[in-house]
Design a protein with these regions (language model features):
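Short alpha-helical DNA-recognition segment
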Residues: 97-116
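DNA-contacting interfaces and partner/effector-binding or oligomerization modules
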Residues: 1-65
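Short, conserved catalytic or interaction motifs in soluble domains
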Residues: 119
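DNA major-groove recognition helix of helix-turn-helix/homeodomain DNA-binding modules
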Residues: 126-143
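Residues that mark the N-terminal boundary/hinge immediately upstream of a DNA-recognition element
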Residues: 42, 99, 125-129
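A short, Lys/Arg-rich alpha-helix, primarily the initiator
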Residues: 72-97, 142
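Short, charged recognition helix plus adjacent turn
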Residues: 143-154
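DNA-binding alpha-helical recognition surfaces that contact promoter or target DNA
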Residues: 48, 89, 93, 116, ...
């Protein structure tokens, strides 16, 4: 098996949670998002439920235009945000006080196309669009790290 070096492009956002065991149940809370909480009967189940709860609330609130607190709290338990949700959150944060129409004009796309970029249920930007957004906002939406993967040999 040969190893090939490739670059992995990803968007990563994590919120950290607390786990508290009480009466055989693991309770999960997100200090940065006090209205997001859940539980599980095992640590693994609690963290799976945390991922579902976190992403469900973030997707719902982002698609409705509700401001989202960015992660500040750090603990042992990190919960990843789905890439489409993280992208929509960071795009909205970077837009700041600019209107969607202003940014759409800079991208040379329609206002409705830009609205879809900020909606986690609809966002599906091309790499070209992401590259343009990175220039407009001077912000790296995507990171890349070299990773070794086995090269496929038939």
């Amino acid at each position: 098996m040969t190893i090939q070096l490739i670059y992995c492009i990803f968007l990563l956002m994590k919120y950290y949670c607390t786990l508290k065991k009480e009466d055989g149940v693991y309770y999960v809370a997100f200090p940065d998002l006090p209205h997001v909480f859940t539980f599980g009967y095992t640590k693994k189940e609690a963290l799976e439920m945390a991922r579902e709860a976190l992403n469900g609330v973030l997707e719902s609130e982002t698609s409705r235009g509700i401001k989202i607190a960015l992660p500040n709290f750090i603990s042992e338990y990190a919960v990843e945000v789905e890439p489409n949700i993280a992208f929509a959150i960071m795009l909205r944060k970077n837009r700041g006080n600019k209107t969607q129409i202003e940014v759409a004009d800079k991208l040379n796309i329609s206002y409705q196309q830009y609205q879809n970029l900020e909606n986690p249920k609809k966002t599906n930007p091309t790499l070209k669009t992401i590259a343009k957004l990175q220039k407009i906002f001077d912000y790296k939406f995507l990171n890349h790290t070299p990773q070794k993967i086995p090269k496929f040999k038939p």
